[in-house]
Design a protein with these regions (language model features):
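Catalytic domains of riboflavin
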Residues: 1-176
Length: 176
């Protein structure tokens, strides 16, 4: 779950699920850039921090959000988790960015044999399930769905036949 959408109830449910399924990884994923700002040397494009038993959704959201960095300059120390497959943590960060959320999320890796229980919990709690390949391939898919909305001739010296073309994504894109 993205840190911005996390509630204390959701965090408790995920913590309980990780314990019940003996998940090999339950952590708070942040981007390498955010880790650097928090003075945590990143080892990959995304790192995982241990979630303490007393950590709240607000604590994690505040850690993800840089707007209070100047008022709380001495955060930490942070306990790093051994992250699962870096492709998974990087995909979680990318998914947050695609959703235009802060690049941070609480993640659980399923233990072998517990994947079905995790998927059932996800379905019952309206939690997205996707594949890393779908996340990685999204920019190409999105680019292929662009439609031309207008174009205009822009004669330039030495390139008199130049045109500028504007495209729009199928969902309308972000506001400007």
């Amino acid at each position: 779950r993205a840190a911005e959408d996390l509630t204390d109830t959701g965090l408790k449910e995920m913590r309980d699920l990780a314990r019940e399924t003996d998940a090999p990884h339950f952590g708070f994923i942040i981007s390498a850039r955010r880790a650097e700002v928090l003075h945590i040397p990143p080892k990959s494009n995304a790192i995982s921090l241990r979630i303490g038993q007393n950590d709240t959704a607000s604590d994690l959201s505040a850690l993800a959000d840089p707007t209070d960095d100047l008022t709380h300059p001495l955060r930490g120390p942070f306990a790093r988790n051994e992250a699962p497959n870096p492709l998974l943590t990087e995909a979680a960060i990318k998914l947050c960015k695609l959703a235009r959320l802060l690049p941070s999320a609480v993640v659980i890796s399923a233990a072998s044999g517990a994947a079905e229980a995790l998927l059932l919990w996800m379905r019952n709690n309206d939690v997205l399930s996707t594949q890393v390949s779908e996340i990685k391939g999204f920019p190409e898919t999105e680019a292929n769905a662009l439609t031309e909305v207008t174009s205009a001739k822009v004669p330039l010296e030495g390139a008199e036949d130049t045109r500028i073309v504007a495209f729009r994504p199928a969902d309308g894109g972000i506001e400007h």
